[in-house]
C-alpha cells in the first residue's frame, strides 16, 4: 500500500521540545510499516517550532515571509525524523514532488516538509498523495478525528466517525490559513482531497495509533470520496 502521512509538527515536537525516545518511537513505527512492504511518504509540520518563530517574525514581516520561516521549520523537523530512520531514508529533505518521487522509487521512506508559501503541510501532503497516486492519506494530529466543532474549545463537540470529502469541505470551508495555523485539515487540503478523491484518515498522532491504520483498528475519522 502506498501511504502519505501528514504528521503534525506539534505531535512530533511537543511544547516541551524534542525527545529522543519519542522520535525513535515514530521512526520504529514507520520502519515497521516499510518492512511490511508499504510505500511510505511523510510530510512533517512545523508545529511549535514554527509558531514560536512566526509569532516573533510577524511583528516585523508579512505573511509570505512568515510562511518561509514556517517552511524552514518543517524541514528542520523532517531532518530530525530522517536522522532516526537510518538507511530507511535518504539523508536529504526533498523540496518538490519530483524529487520525492525519485526517493520513493529508490525504495526509501520519503520525509519532507513544506514547499510553497500559503500551503500548509496538510495541503502539501494531499498534493503529494495525488501526485504519486497514493492509496491513502493519513492526517496524524493532536486531535483524534474530525469533529463538528473544535473539541479543544467546545466541550459539546461531537466526533464524526465517517464522512465524505464533500462534507469535509463544508466543515473546513471557513478555517484560517495564516502562517503557522493549526486547523485539523485546512480548506486547501480539503479541496485537494475532494478533487483527487483521496481516501483520508484523521487520527490522533500517537505512534501506536498510526500503526493501527494497517488493520483498520484505529479510532479516527474515515473520509471517503
From Swiss-Prot:
Main location group: cytoplasm
Pfam families (UniProt xref): AA_kinase
Pathway stated in the Swiss-Prot or TrEMBL entry: Pyrimidine metabolism; CTP biosynthesis via de novo pathway; UDP from UMP (UMPK route): step 1/1
GO cellular component, one term: cytoplasm
Residues involved in ATP binding: 9-10, 47, 51, 141-142, 147, 150
Gene Ontology MF term list: ATP binding; UMP kinase activity
Binding site residues for UMP: 46, 67, 115-121
Domain of life: Archaea
Family: Belongs to the UMP kinase family.
Annotated function: Catalyzes the reversible phosphorylation of UMP to UDP.
PANTHER family associated with the record: URIDYLATE KINASE, URIDYLATE KINASE PUMPKIN, CHLOROPLASTIC
The protein's name: Uridylate kinase
Amino acid at each position: 500500500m502506498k501511504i502519505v502521512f501528514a504528521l503534525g509538527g506539534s505531535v512530533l515536537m511537543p511544547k516541551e521540545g524534542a525527545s529522543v525516545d519519542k522520535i525513535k518511537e515514530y521512526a520504529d513505527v514507520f520502519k515497521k510499516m516499510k518492512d511490511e512492504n508499504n510505500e511510505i511518504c511523510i510530510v512533517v509540520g512545523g508545529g511549535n517550532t514554527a509558531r514560536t518563530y512566526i509569532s516573533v517574525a510577524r511583528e516585523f514581516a508579512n505573511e509570505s515571509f512568515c510562511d518561509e520561516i514556517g517552511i524552514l521549520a518543517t524541514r528542520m523537523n523532517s531532518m530530525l525524523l530522517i536522522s532516526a530512520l537510518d538507511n530507511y531514508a535518504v539523508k536529504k529533505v526533498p523540496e518538490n514532488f519530483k524529487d520525492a518521487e525519485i526517493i520513493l522509487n529508490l525504495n526509501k521512506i520519503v520525509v519532507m516538509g513544506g514547499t510553497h508559501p500559503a500551503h500548509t503541510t496538510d495541503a502539501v501532503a494531499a498534493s503529494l498523495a495525488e501526485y504519486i497516486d497514493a492509496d491513502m492519506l493519513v492526517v496524524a494530529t493532536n486531535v483524534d478525528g474530525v469533529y463538528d466543532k473544535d473539541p479543544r474549545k467546545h466541550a459539546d463537540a461531537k466526533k464524526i466517525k465517517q464522512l465524505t470529502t464533500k462534507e469535509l469541505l463544508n466543515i473546513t470551508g471557513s478555517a484560517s490559513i495564516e502562517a503557522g495555523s493549526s486547523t485539523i485539515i485546512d480548506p486547501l487540503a480539503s479541496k485537494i482531497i475532494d478533487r483527487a478523491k483521496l481516501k483520508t484518515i484523521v487520527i490522533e498522532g500517537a505512534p501506536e495509533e498510526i500503526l493501527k491504520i494497517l488493520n483498520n483498528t484505529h479510532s479516527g475519522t474515515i473520509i471517503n470520496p
